């Protein structure tokens, strides 16, 4: 080997080394989060003074409720996770933010509320109580975490108690913390020395202890299907169940004020219970809410209900026997699917219709339009596609809805077609919309006149249809436990099943690129299927590393982006026979849908809105070289 050959070899090795290093960097930097629209349903609420504090997805919202009939938002702050529970003490809000752990928010000036500190936790932060400089946080399977918040900017854990079951809720009274531990009932923790807590008592409850409130010598437990349970804790080491009240629905939330307990019953709204005789609680009032009552807080003569997709409901309870709503603030529901076109993203909000998000500045997306679909909350938009100036919404029990989005700020429905099944997904090709209609199979809709759509064909193969992609005269459907189905739609009025392939999981998302179909197969991960011969699809590889459940997939360039329950997975599929993980991002909600558009990836994150990511680079450098000048890689040695 002469000197020049040796130099060429060394230069080539350097390129390989740089590529390897860049690949590692990409695994860390890809996907790169660019922006968030983090709004979603309301789970938790607290009230203090003239303000109500509640969650909308991963946003803490502060509302002025000094006039209960006219509540209005005065501040908001984005958080690292979904707002499951919160406590307010002085000018700080302490938020149990799900995957984001504990967030400490300065609310002294509501209009400029700011996160001043936080602490990641091992599990899912579901509830929090604050007392004497400590936050007591329930962290799902990780029990009770005791966190020193004397310096709000630098909270740190001082101890924990690994309670049995699922730690859902917590209340603190005196020297004791009371933990609602799911099917393991109520646990009583001595916190007289926060650094050395210990469980001193427990009582089983007949249902699932979700939330707890303490007043005087009694703890009041929202016990799931078993309603309200009243526990005498006058002797904390020997708690005793002394009363109960069966309620219609699922007791999810509770607060106590005076002689009354206020219980949130999910879809059955608010119940007011007289607890003046703890051994004999009596329902005295009720009020159904439009959503699901997930959280409740009482302040003065008002009850504030975190009503899931119903937002914040303000209820006058000055007469506990006759509660009535006086005001509300709406929130979005669950982001099930997303598609992007131009400078807008379109979100299928299962609980409240189609939302239009301006993404012209992807670092700061803003909602600009919304249209409700019929039958809310049962309309349940599950999928969305865009063609021209129309959005096509798969609306579950309400079939296909066609929305004019020519003016994004004022979308309106122009046409619809009821379908016999449950419309989960939709794809548009030419003059036809193809609806994955669950048990109703694949429906083919002529949308050449969007105001007068008409079904022209259908096929009801085994397994149903839960998502669909159309390419080259074929519709490819994710068919649940039937796997992948290939349907010839060259004659839209006469679709014909021409090929199929069973998958090990439950096929519910699909994308097609070239001769490859990419199937999000739930527990089966990502399946890579050669469909170059549509009648004979063949799996060439798969990626299933136990990272959760693959719900949806979008392919852009050399990468497959998989909505994988709690994260976005990025899979390098440049060699389709050997997919390799290139990166991942833990999303604050449940990554349910994913779409690629231009240089961005959009994730529908269920109860945390939408995240926008930069498309991962095809190569470590845009042109394959570190600089734009290839001579920088010259191997010539004088």
Language model feature labels by segment:
Residues 10, 26-27, 625:
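N-terminal targeting leader peptides, primarily classical Sec-type signal peptides for secretion
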Residues 1-13:
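Bacterial N-terminal signal peptides that target proteins for export
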Residues 619-631:
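Extracellular carbohydrate-recognition regions
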Residues 630-638:
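Extracellular glycan-recognition surfaces and repeat-rich motifs
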Residues 11-22:
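Bacterial N-terminal signal peptides
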Residues 25-618:
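Feature marking well-ordered beta-strand scaffolds used for ligand recognition
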């Amino acid at each position: 080997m002469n000197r020049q050959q040796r130099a060429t070899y060394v230069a080539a090795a350097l390129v390989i080394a740089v590529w390897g290093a860049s690949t590692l960097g990409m695994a860390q930097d890809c996907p790169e989060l660019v922006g968030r629209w983090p709004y979603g349903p309301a789970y938790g609420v607290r009230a203090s003074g003239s303000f109500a504090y509640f969650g909308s997805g991963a946003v803490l919202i502060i509302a002025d409720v000094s006039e209960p009939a006219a509540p209005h938002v005065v501040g908001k702050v984005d958080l690292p996770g979904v707002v499951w529970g919160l406590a307010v003490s002085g000018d700080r809000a302490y938020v149990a933010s799900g995957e984001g752990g504990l967030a400490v928010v300065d609310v002294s000036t509501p209009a400029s509320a700011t996160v001043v500190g936080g602490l990641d936790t091992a599990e899912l932060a579901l509830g929090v109580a604050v007392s004497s400089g400590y936050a007591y946080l329930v962290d799902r399977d990780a029990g009770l975490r005791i966190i020193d918040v004397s310096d709000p900017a630098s909270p740190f854990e001082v101890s924990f108690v690994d309670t049995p079951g699922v730690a859902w809720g917590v209340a603190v009274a005196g020297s004791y913390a009371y933990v609602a531990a799911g099917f393991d009932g109520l646990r009583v923790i001595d916190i007289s020395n926060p650094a050395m807590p210990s469980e001193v008592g427990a009582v089983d409850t007949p249902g699932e202890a979700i939330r707890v409130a303490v007043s005087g010598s009694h703890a009041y437990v929202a016990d799931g299907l078993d309603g309200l349970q009243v526990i005498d804790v006058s002797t904390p080491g020997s708690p005793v169940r002394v009363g109960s009240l069966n309620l219609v629905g699922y007791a999810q939330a509770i607060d106590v004020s005076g002689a009354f307990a206020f219980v949130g019953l999910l879809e059955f709204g608010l119940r007011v219970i007289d607890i003046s005789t703890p051994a004999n609680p009596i329902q005295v009032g009720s009020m159904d809410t439009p959503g699901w009552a997930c959280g409740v807080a009482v302040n003065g003569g008002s009850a504030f209900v975190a009503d899931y997709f119903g937002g914040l409901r303000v209820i006058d309870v000055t007469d506990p026997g006759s509660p009535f709503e006086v005001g509300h603030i709406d929130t979005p529901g669950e982001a099930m699917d997303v598609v992007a076109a131009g400078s807008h993203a379109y979100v299928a909000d299962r609980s409240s219709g189609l939302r239009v998000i301006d993404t012209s500045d992807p670092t700061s997306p803003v909602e600009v339009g919304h249209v409700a679909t019929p039958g809310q909350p049962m309309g349940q938009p599950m999928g969305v596609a865009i063609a021209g100036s129309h959005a096509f919404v798969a609306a579950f029990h309400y079939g296909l809805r066609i929305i004019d989005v020519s003016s994004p700020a004022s979308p309106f429905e122009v046409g619809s077609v009821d379908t016999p099944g449950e419309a989960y997904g939709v794809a548009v090709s030419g003059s036809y919309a193809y609806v994955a209609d669950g048990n109703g199979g694949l429906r083919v809709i002529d949308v050449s006149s969007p105001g007068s759509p008409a079904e022209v064909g259908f096929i009801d193969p085994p397994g149903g249809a839960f998502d669909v992609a159309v390419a080259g005269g074929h519709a490819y459907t994710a068919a649940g436990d039937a796997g992948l189905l290939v349907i010839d739609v060259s004659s839209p009025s006469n679709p014909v099943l021409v090929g199929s392939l069973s998958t090990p999981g439950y096929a519910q998302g699909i994308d097609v690129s070239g001769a490859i179909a990419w199937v999000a197969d739930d527990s089966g991960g990502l399946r890579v299927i050669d469909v170059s011969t549509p009648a004979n699809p063949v799996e060439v590889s798969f990626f299933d590393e136990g990272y959760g459940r693959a719900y949806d997939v979008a392919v852009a360039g050399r990468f497959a982006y998989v909505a994988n329950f709690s994260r976005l997975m990025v899979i390098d599929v440049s060699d389709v026979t050997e997919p390799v993980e290139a990166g991942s991002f833990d999303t604050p909600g449940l990554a349910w849908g994913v779409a690629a558009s231009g240089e961005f990836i959009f994730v529908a994150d269920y109860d945390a809105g939408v995240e926008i990511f930069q498309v991962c680079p095809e190569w470590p450098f845009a042109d394959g070289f570190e600089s734009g000048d290839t001579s920088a890689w010259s191997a010539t040695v004088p």
